[in-house]
Amino acid sequence: SLAVACVLALGNISDRMEKGLSQQSREFMAGDRSLQSSRAVPKAWIDEARQRGLKVGEQLTFATMTFARDTPQLANVKAVDDVYPMYGTLQTNPPGLKPQPGSVLLAPRLMALLNLKIGDSIDVGDATLRIAGEVVQEPDSGFNPFQIAPRLMMNMADVEKTAAVQPGSRVTWRYKFGGTPQQLEAYEKWLLPQLKPEQRWYGLEQDEGALGKSLERSQQFLL
């Protein structure tokens, strides 16, 4: 009947929309799930995830002073590994760049504040790194009204050279996980009993930011 056909059609549309939202949520997070911690998690946790077939990426964010020809400027540093971004696109100028060892990507505002151009060098802590380009948009940047300092992106391999991260430093580790729903669910059951109170395992649905709340409302509408 017409009523049955309409219900089936609406169901198909709802399924397609939900799949589209799921794909977008992956890109907004640059992963299917995130693990956030104020310190590096045990290597065994990452090894276990990879043994279960999950793809894992690591990020570290912290604030530190940068210098260009003795001019200081606080920067919000995001160090990433070669997996980044697991999903989504890092928009840069010139296009197609990723943070490579020995080089950095700067937000246009940081470039302007320090009067720098692509190809110049910048001191990040004890390390002198070459500016390969500008960060235009990060897939997982979200919206953080408290992030006052402009972004500087670097490769995880260069963090130790900066000496900016010491015991007691305020840092945030984020581990991004990608895999099938079954792989993620099995790993979650293994991981959750081991988490400390300051550690958080979440998908975009559990994210407290605006994107997470928007996705939750969209899913409720589809249901």
What are the language-model segments listed below?
Residues 1-223:
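Membrane transport/envelope proteins' first extracytoplasmic loop
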